[in-house]
């Protein structure tokens, strides 16, 4: 007997690890594959975006592999029981709103600066400590590399 059915939006490696952990805790798991090739084959039923309503109806609670999902999908999932909740996901999916919230709550993060145009880049890099900066998009951009800061001639690393 299971404790209920968890729906995970996503079919990648993080969903695989989450689903395996949920199974060990006694939950059944269903997956909604958004845009990746499923690596969760054999772990539970797999649905696709055109089956969103059917997926949601089959689940007792919903969680996500990543926060950058279409608003309409998140809103529908919120009606079932979405964790983290819709507002948290919207705040967390964009790096600038995420960092601003953490700053407002006095939760330490790495130094950061929002750059919205090439003209702002030099000042932003100059305001950050060290000789390297990690430039990322505010949405997505998980693999932004550490780039040498051309404006930091004498800064310690």
Model-derived segments and spans:
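Solvent-exposed alpha-helices and their adjacent loops that cap or buttress functional pockets
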Residues: 1, 55, 126-128, 138-141
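Short coil/turn connectors at secondary-structure junctions
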Residues: 3-4, 27, 129-131, 144
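Short, hinge-like loop/turn segments at secondary-structure boundaries
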Residues: 46-49, 80-81, 100-101, 129-130, ...
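Short acidic-hydrophobic, aromatic-tinged amphipathic segments that line or gate anion-handling sites
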Residues: 44-51, 113-117, 147-153
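Glycine-/Pro-rich loop/turn segments that contact NAD(P) or position catalytic residues
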Residues: 90-132, 149
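ATP-binding N-terminal substructure of ATP-dependent carboxylate-amine bond-forming enzymes
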Residues: 1-93, 119
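Glycine-rich phosphate-binding loop of ATP-grasp-fold ATP-dependent ligases
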Residues: 110-112, 132-157
